[in-house]
Amino acid sequence: MFAAQISTQTAIIILVLFGLAWVGFGWWLGRRNRTVDDFMLAGRNVGLALASATAMATWVTSNTTLVAPQLTYQFGVWGMIGYSMAALGLILFAPMAKRIKTLMPKGFTCGDFIRVRYGRGAWYVFLVVSFCYAMGWLISLGMAGGILLHSLSGLDYHVGMTVILAICVGYTLLGGLKAVIATDFIQTLIILCGVLFIGYVCWQDVGLERIYDSVSREQPQLLNLLFPAAIMFLFNNIFFGIGEIFHSNVWWSRAFAFREGVGKKAYLISGLLWLPIPIVTGFIALAAPALGIYPPSPDMVGPLVAAKLLGSVGAVFVFIVVFSALASSLDSLLAATSDLLTEDIYRGILKPGASNEHLFKVSKWVILGLGLLTWVLCLPRMTTLGELLNFTGAFVASTIWPIVFGLYRPRLGGVYAGSAMLLGTIIGLVAYVQIGFYVAALTSCLVSLVVCLIGLALYNDEFNWERLQRMEK
């Protein structure tokens, strides 16, 4: 085990200061929230600068700063390139965001689209898929908080995980999507500056030649461009990233919240800004052998290398950068999943007659409950972050084609869309267990595509797009 790079006392001070700052900022921003539209969708009036920043910061998750180095450490060059291909999800979602805003100007969630477009059968399947993914991502973020604190300060995993979850739940609860988007803007600046600085120090202090020599001597397979598992991971991660964004209410809620004409530009800018970040964070993992670092768990390699390069003062800097990345994703996911539970489960199934004022109160309780459930599920650290995240790939990749065809083609029916998601998920999970985590999304996406193509060939009725405009119940 490695010696802690910063003292436990310093870590606690940083957490307290940042926690008070974010929670106070969330309270200040949330003072004028009066309606469910204000709380869930920031008044549907977010401009280009904040829109681009929140999309980019949300996608720079703790997984980008912890899992990208882990996958580079395991799969080499293709690991970091494969992870960076998740930017395609943001870039390809850009035209879809415009289409979503046009079709559903009064929409709340992605669940609204599936329910109206495909009917309740496909909607139920989609909700199960979406919640399984959301909980997987929430757990990975909570775990990442505990791993971060433990790696850099020696603070117990459970303490770190609890504190970071409490901070993010606190300011999301007080400020809603306004607080999420505003803090994302600040966190984006911290992340971009921090990642570039750490990458530059690694390049200057260790050097490409030394990194290449140590990796080729100790782990030559990481430099092999024909490494079979790494190639499968590359294509798997492309479809995983696309599925994550296309189906998740995190991104749909922003499409609804952004001002008219902003969504397409914002997602394109954020995708291009995000693209190099996993390459930089993955690159530092290749320096681990040259620095004599052999982490007990591969998902600890990123913080340990960065702390080694920058020393104790630098470790504080690393801590702040990764904490910002963690918070920028956790708050967004809490808010978006709460919206889905409130709008689709509570109003859609349990209490159809609920007023907007009542939903405003319910959504806050849902955020609190989600935070508590995530904390309980994070207590046993069951797997590595990479494996947990890719487990959800089988769920999300099955939704890609039903959503794409549903937005642009009027002939795909609900039975086929629901079957595509269900069969894709099941067969993807079988592939995850029988072959490996690096093929789950690829298999799921392929099965879903086949079912959707069969549906397009056999189904003759055409959907009336005006039903989405009217938001039929």
What are these regions (language model features)?
Residues 1-473:
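Membrane-embedded helix-loop-helix hairpins and adjacent transmembrane boundary segments
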